[in-house]
C-alpha cells in the first residue's frame, strides 16, 4: 500500500525492513514524523478492516500510543506491505472439557498483509519478529477474531488447527489454554508471571528480522517452534517434528515472564532468602529474625523499620537499598516463621515446594 511518501524513511530505514512501534517509541518521535506515521497506520488499519470485514479499524496511531500494545510493520521504500499487532490480554478461555481458565496471555490482535504481496513470506517474517520480541512461540498465542486466511496461515506454517470456539472470539490451542491457566494460578500466589517452557524461545538477537532487510527474498517457513523433548532414540533431521500433547506440555517447567512494555530479558536470579533458610537445619531455637536478615542481606542492605531502630540501635545509614521495601520484609518474616516451624518438626525438605522463585531454569 502506497501513501505518497517514502515509508521506509518515515521509520528510519534506508530502503526496506521490519520496524517495531511501541507507545514509548511513538511518544519520542518528532511531531512531523508522527503525522507521517499516523497516515500510514490509519491507512493500514482501514485496509485490515476491509480485508476482515470489521465494522471499524482496530489499528491506528492512537491505539498504539495509548496502550501497551506493540506493532510490527513490513515496509519497502514507499510501500507498507503488512502489519502485526500484539499485546497481553486478560482472558477467560474454555478448554476441551469446558473448564474455564483465567489467564494473562500473549495475543495476536491484528494481522494484515496487502493483497498484492501475499504468499511472499511477509507474514512469516512479521510473526518471527514478534516471536523474537516476546520470546514466546506463536503456538502459545491467542488470536483475536482470526480470519479464514489467518487460520489457513497458522495451519500451514505452525501446524495449528482444531481450535475450540470461544464466547470472547479469541482462539487458542487447547494445550495453551491449560498451560496459561495453570500459569495464572501460580501468578495469584507468587505475583510473578511465567512463560511455559513449551512456548519459550531462546535468547536470540532480533537483528535478523528487525531493521534493514531484503523483503523480496522468501522467508523460510518453519513448521513448528514448540520445544520437543529429547528422547534416547536418535531421529533423522528430515523427520517431521512431533507435536506435543497437552499432558506433555503441562509437565514442563516455567520461567519468569518479563513485562510487555520493554524487550524481555531473563537473567538468572539467586534463590530467595526464605527458601535458602528453609534448606538449613536449625538446632535449638535458632537465630532471631533480625539475625537471619543480617546473615542473608548484610548490615548495609538491611531495612530496619522505624519502630525498632531505637531498640536495636541501628543507624539510619543502614537503610541503603531502596528496592527492599517494607512489604518484602513482612513477607520474609512470614517465610521465616513458617521455615522455623518446619525445621522444628524436622521436615525442612518437604516445605520448600513451589515457593522458590528463580529465573531461567532447565
From Swiss-Prot:
EC number of this enzyme: 2.3.1.108
Task: Please list the residue ranges annotated as the N-acetyltransferase domain.
Answer: 1-177
What keywords sit in the KW lines? Answer: Acyltransferase, Transferase
Which residues participate in acetyl-CoA binding? Answer: 111-124, 147-156
Q: Which GO terms describe its biological process?
A: regulation of microtubule cytoskeleton organization
Catalysed conversion reaction: L-lysyl-[alpha-tubulin] + acetyl-CoA = N(6)-acetyl-L-lysyl-[alpha-tubulin] + CoA + H(+)
Which InterPro entries does the UniProt record give? Acyl_CoA_acyltransferase, Atat, GNAT_ATAT
Q: Does the keyword Transferase apply?
A: yes
Q: Where is this site: Crucial for catalytic activity?
A: 52
Q: Which GO terms describe its molecular function?
A: tubulin N-acetyltransferase activity
Q: Give Gene Ontology CC terms.
A: microtubule
Does Phosphoprotein show up as a keyword for this record?
no
Q: Which HAMAP family match?
A: mec17 (MF_03130)
What does the UniProt record say this protein does?
Specifically acetylates 'Lys-40' in alpha-tubulin on the lumenal side of microtubules. Promotes microtubule destabilization and accelerates microtubule dynamics; this activity may be independent of acetylation activity. Acetylates alpha-tubulin with a slow enzymatic rate, due to a catalytic site that is not optimized for acetyl transfer. Enters the microtubule through each end and diffuses quickly throughout the lumen of microtubules.
User: What's the family?
Assistant: Belongs to the acetyltransferase ATAT1 family.
Query: Which protein, by its recorded name, is this?
Result: Alpha-tubulin N-acetyltransferase
Q: Which organism is it from?
A: Giardia intestinalis (strain ATCC 50803 / WB clone C6) (Giardia lamblia)
Amino acid at each position: 500500500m502506497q501513501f505518497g511518501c517514502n515509508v521506509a524513511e518515515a521509520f528510519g530505514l534506508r530502503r526496506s525492513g521490519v520496524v517495531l512501534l511501541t507507545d514509548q517509541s511513538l511518544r519520542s518521535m518528532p511531531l512531523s514524523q508522527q503525522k507521517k506515521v499516523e497516515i500510514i497506520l490509519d491507512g493500514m488499519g482501514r485496509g485490515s478492516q476491509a480485508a476482515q470485514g470489521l465494522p471499524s479499524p482496530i489499528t491506528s496511531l492512537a491505539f498504539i500510543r495509548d496502550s501497551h500494545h506493540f506493532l510490527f510493520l513490513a515496509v519497502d521504500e514507499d510501500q507498507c506491505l503488512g502489519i502485526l499487532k500484539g499485546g497481553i490480554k486478560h482472558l477467560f478461555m474454555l478448554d476441551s472439557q469446558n473448564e474455564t481458565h483465567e489467564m494473562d496471555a500473549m495475543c495476536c490482535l491484528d494481522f494484515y498483509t496487502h493483497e498484492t504481496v501475499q504468499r511472499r513470506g511477509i507474514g512469516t517474517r512479521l510473526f518471527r519478529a514478534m516471536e523474537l520480541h516476546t520470546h514466546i512461540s506463536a503456538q502459545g498465542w491467542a488470536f483475536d477474531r482470526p480470519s479464514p486466511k489467518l487460520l489457513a496461515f497458522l495451519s500451514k506454517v505452525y501446524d495449528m488447527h482444531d481450535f475450540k470456539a470461544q464466547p470472547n472470539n479469541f482462539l487458542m490451542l487447547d494445550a495453551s489454554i491449560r498451560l496459561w491457566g495453570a500459569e495464572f494460578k501460580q501468578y495469584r500466589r507468587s505475583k510473578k508471571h511465567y512463560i511455559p517452557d513449551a512456548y519459550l524461545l531462546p535468547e536470540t538477537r532480533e537483528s535478523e528480522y528487525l531493521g534493514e532487510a531484503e523483503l523480496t527474498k522468501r522467508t523460510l517457513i518453519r513448521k513448528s517452534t514448540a520445544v520437543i523433548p529429547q528422547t534416547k532414540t536418535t531421529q533423522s533431521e528430515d523427520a517431521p517434528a512431533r507435536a506435543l500433547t497437552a499432558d506433555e506440555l503441562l509437565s514442563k517447567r516455567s520461567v519468569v515472564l518479563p513485562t510487555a512494555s520493554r524487550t524481555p530479558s531473563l537473567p538468572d536470579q539467586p534463590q530467595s532468602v526464605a527458601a535458602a533458610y528453609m534448606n538449613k537445619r536449625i538446632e535449638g531455637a535458632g537465630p532471631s529474625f533480625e539475625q537471619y536478615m543480617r546473615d542473608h542481606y548484610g548490615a548495609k542492605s538491611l531495612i530496619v523499620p522505624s519502630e525498632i531502630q531505637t531498640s536495636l540501635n541501628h543507624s539510619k545509614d543502614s537503610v541503603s537499598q531502596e528496592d527492599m521495601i517494607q512489604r518484602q520484609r513482612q513477607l520474609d518474616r512470614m517465610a521465616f516463621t513458617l521455615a522455623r516451624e518446619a525445621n522444628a518438626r524436622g521436615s525442612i525438605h518437604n516445605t520448600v515446594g513451589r515457593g522458590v522463585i528463580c529465573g531461567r531454569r532447565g
